[in-house]
Structures are given as structure tokens and as C-alpha cells.
Regions:
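Bacterial N-terminal signal peptides
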Residues: 14-22
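A short small-residue
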Residues: 88, 146, 237-239, 335-337
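Active-site-proximal helix/loop microenvironment
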Residues: 194-271
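Active-site-adjacent loops and short helices of periplasmic peptidoglycan-processing enzymes
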Residues: 31-212
Length: 373
């Protein structure tokens, strides 16, 4: 795999007339005794100034495809695709913060696994869910409470949050790792860019609706009933404010870069990296989104997110993930539909088309990769 990645870089350097210089600069790093004999006396490995990193341009056909898909969709949409191996990125509106909704569960789990790597918490830490922990909307764990209590673990909460998008599981995990402050600190420490973590599920959803949160809203459909009683202008003002400046906003390019760092092992230990990607590959949500265009032999580790609806508009319809080809090459993909009135099938089709274009590009490059190898 290292050889194939080098071949891509070598071709790019050759086109720029830099291949000989790059090869000379790389030679002292080899462990070949013949090269060592040619080094000057007193040479210290790594003493030379660092070479400037060569940026491989994004493939023009894929740039054209992504621009066309997003430009023809309408609404507020950001898409980013990054080659985890070559490093290039294709993005359209990639720097515009979009409502994350449940995509933000990824940052909570990353924070938890980071603390596990530090020895501060464990996957097997016992935790208790009570009625005071319940949130709203999708929370299947609520049905497991017996006499108002359910005993669980960090491991189960991660699984439920990441594969079922269980809001209560995520919020309980969030509290265990130190709340939004801890998550935002993780994002900042790892320089993940334009990614904000909001106040948690209850405050996020109540503010988007124009309500002040009450724990009674966690029971049954109490939240929906209270929301329906609000004057239309109150709901619309809150909805528009959230879409314009989402408190959980994240840019598609920043998410793609973060997923790239995850896949490269730059965020977590090898064990935690493998564990999280495995959990994300077993996700049960969004079968008609990115996953619908994943061919046999390919793998997708992903997280979806979906916001509230108001008068035919949706604030956040997202899917982000790591798409891995049979040959091991991988791409970080983020499709963030911040606001749209397009039908659900159209939104899903946009996501499917993005994956289809990435796969088509990858397959079109296969003959060149084989020749280079």
C-alpha cells in the first residue's frame, strides 16, 4: 500500500519537474548501506531543513461532478471529499458551517475514546440511566428503563449513539466525559477546524423550536405538543436563526479533514481507532443516504444527522463517513444539507450521487495505479 501511494506522489512530482529533487531528498532516509557510505562525515539524520510538502491537485473530473451536483440541487448545501491517501480535497461550499444534528455524536464518542486512551475512563464503566436523563425524539434506550432505571456501560452508550443515533445514550455519554466543554476542548486540541459542538440534545432541539426546555418534554410526545402550540412566527424565527447561525455548526471540509485524521490514526490509539471505525461500519441509520451507492466490496463507516422540519423545510439532513475501496484506499466524504425544501428522496439521491462519483473516479484511476505499481 505504501508503494502505491508513493507512485501517485511520484507522478505528481514528475509532472511538476520535481521528481529528481524529491528522490534525492528522500535518499538519506533509507536504511541502505550503500547510500550511507555516500553521506558526508558528521551527517546527522534529519539535519536537513524540511522539504515543502507537495500538494497533489484534486482530480478535475471529480471537481466538475461535485460542483455540478451541488450547484443543481439548490438550498444550503456543503460537500467535501478528501483522498485519505493522496491528500487532495474536492469541496463545494466546504467552508460554510451547516447544522450537524446527530453528526455531532461523533465528537462525543471521539472525546470518550480519547479519555479511554488516557486511562481516565473505561469502555466498561457502569452508568445509570434514569428518567431525568431522558431527552426527546429518537431515544430507544428509554424503553429499557424498569422502575425508572436502566444500568448500562460506556461501551453500550457508544454503540447506541453511533449505530442507532440514540439521543439519550449520547447525552448520558456526554455528561460522563465532562459535557460540551470537554468535547469542544477535544476539537480545539486536535485542530479540527470549523466544528462546533452545541449544548446537548435537549437545549439544541428546544432552541431550534423556540421553546425553553422542561424535563417534562422528554415524556412521550410532550415536546411535539408544546411545539405545536407556539405561534408560527415564533417557530419560524427560531428555525431561521438556527439555520443562519447553527450552534452546532460544522463545515463539510473540516469534517472531511477530521475523518481523515481519524482514519490515519492521528486522533486516537490504534485500538480505539479500529474500534470506532468498526462501530461506524455497523451503523443502522441512513440506508438510503451514502450507503445506498456503496458497491460490493467497499466499506462505509459513517454517521448521519437529521434536524427538525418546519413548513416543508428541514434544518440539517446529513451523512458523513469514511469510504474504503477493496484495494484499501479510502476517502472521507461529508454531505451536509443545511437547509432545503427538496423532497427526502432528492436529498438521498444527492448523497448517493456523491458516492457514485467517488467510486467512478477511483475505478477510472485503477489502470494507472496498476501500471505505476
Amino acid at each position: 500500500m505504501v508503494l502505491s501511494r508513493f507512485s501517485v506522489l511520484e507522478r505528481a512530482l514528475t509532472l511538476g519537474g520535481l521528481a529528481p529533487l524529491a528522490l534525492i531528498g528522500a535518499a538519506p532516509q533509507q536504511q541502505d548501506g550503500r547510500i550511507t557510505e555516500l553521506l558526508p562525515p558528521g551527517y546527522v539524520h534529519g539535519s536537513a531543513p524540511p522539504q515543502s510538502q507537495v500538494v497533489i491537485p484534486a482530480p478535475t473530473p471529480l471537481v466538475t461532478d461535485i460542483n455540478s451536483l451541488v450547484g443543481g440541487f439548490g438550498g444550503k448545501v456543503g460537500v467535501a471529499v478528501k483522498s485519505i491517501d493522496a491528500g487532495w480535497m474536492v469541496a463545494k461550499n466546504g467552508d460554510v458551517p451547516m447544522p450537524q444534528q446527530s453528526v455531532s455524536k461523533l465528537w462525543v464518542t471521539l472525546t470518550a475514546l480519547d479519555q479511554i486512551d488516557q486511562g481516565r475512563i473505561s469502555l466498561d464503566d457502569p452508568l445509570t440511566i434514569t428518567q431525568s436523563d431522558l431527552t426527546l425524539f429518537h431515544q430507544p434506550i428509554a424503553s429499557l428503563l424498569k422502575n425508572g432505571v436502566y444500568q448500562t456501560t460506556v461501551r453500550e452508550l457508544i454503540r447506541r449513539a453511533m449505530t442507532m443515533s440514540d439521543n439519550t445514550a449520547n447525552d448520558r455519554l456526554l455528561r460522563h466525559v465532562g459535557g460540551p466543554t470537554a468535547v469542544n476542548a477535544f476539537i480545539t486540541r486536535h485542530s479540527l477546524g470549523a466544528i462546533k459542538f452545541g449544548p446537548g440534545e435537549r437545549l439544541l432541539q428546544s432552541r431550534t423550536a423556540g421553546l425553553a426546555w422542561k424535563q417534562d418534554y422528554a415524556m412521550g410526545r410532550a415536546f411535539q405538543a408544546a411545539r405545536a402550540k407556539l405561534p408560527p412566527n415564533v417557530r419560524q424565527a427560531a428555525f431561521n436563526s438556527y439555520v443562519a447561525n447553527p450552534i452546532d455548526g460544522a463545515a463539510a471540509a473540516s469534517i472531511a479533514n477530521a475523518l481523515t485524521k481519524l482514519r490515519r490514526g492521528e486522533l486516537l490509539s490504534p485500538a480505539s481507532t479500529s474500534y470506532l471505525i468498526g462501530v461506524m461500519e455497523s451503523s443502522r441509520t441512513g440506508h438510503a443516504r451514502l450507503r445506498a451507492s456503496v458497491p460490493p466490496g467497499w466499506r462505509l463507516a459513517h454517521k448521519t444527522g437529521t434536524g427538525q422540519d418546519l413548513m416543508g423545510r428541514t434544518a440539517g439532513f446529513n451523512d458523513v463517513g469514511i469510504l474504503t475501496a477493496p484495494d484499501g484506499r479510502a476517502y472521507a466524504v461529508a454531505v451536509m444539507i443545511g437547509e432545503t425544501s427538496r423532497p427526502t428522496q432528492d436529498r438521498q439521491k444527492l448523497m448517493q450521487n456523491v458516492v457514485a462519483r467517488v467510486v467512478a473516479y477511483h475505478d477510472s484511476e485503477a489502470p494507472q495505479r496498476l501500471m505505476a505499481e
